[in-house]
A protein has these predicted regions:
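Conserved short histidine dyad/triad with adjacent acidic residue
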Residues: 25, 40-55, 91
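A short, N-terminal "cap"/entry segment at the start of jelly-roll beta-barrel domains
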Residues: 1-38, 51
Length: 117
């Protein structure tokens, strides 16, 4: 699920309480997009996941804000992640995650360059 891009370049500030939304599946809310990068806020309820995938032309950086889960650095491989962690996946590298905790898992994703694929 995805909503519209905010692109609030007047204040250049986004409040998680205003943009973080949970849904029936992992929910991606775009907050900005420029010619070179894009930023999103992801919310995963307990048990929800982002399947392992990669981007042919872009790096993807995840800044973990809340919760705990497992990161998929490769299909079939898991590593624990939690609030305060930063995940860096260079172009072509596999990444995905699952919320294994009891609260929503929230992270900010920065993708560059765009388009990613």
């Amino acid at each position: 699920m995805s909503t519209s891009i905010t692109n609030d370049f007047e204040t250049r500030r986004y409040r998680l309480t205003d943009v973080a939304r949970a849904g029936d599946a992992a929910t991606r809310t775009p907050i900005y997009s420029t010619e070179s990068t894009s930023g999103v806020v992801w919310v995963l309820k307990p048990g929800q996941e982002i399947k392992p995938h990669g981007h042919a032309k872009a790096d993807d950086i995840w800044i973990c804000i809340q919760g705990e889960g497992v990161f998929y650095p490769a299909p079939g491989e898991e590593r624990p992640i939690a609030k305060g962690d930063v995940i860096v996946s260079a172009k072509g590298m596999c990444h995905g995650m699952k919320n294994t905790g009891t609260e929503d898992f929230i992270f900010v994703g920065i993708l560059a360059p765009v388009p990613a694929d």
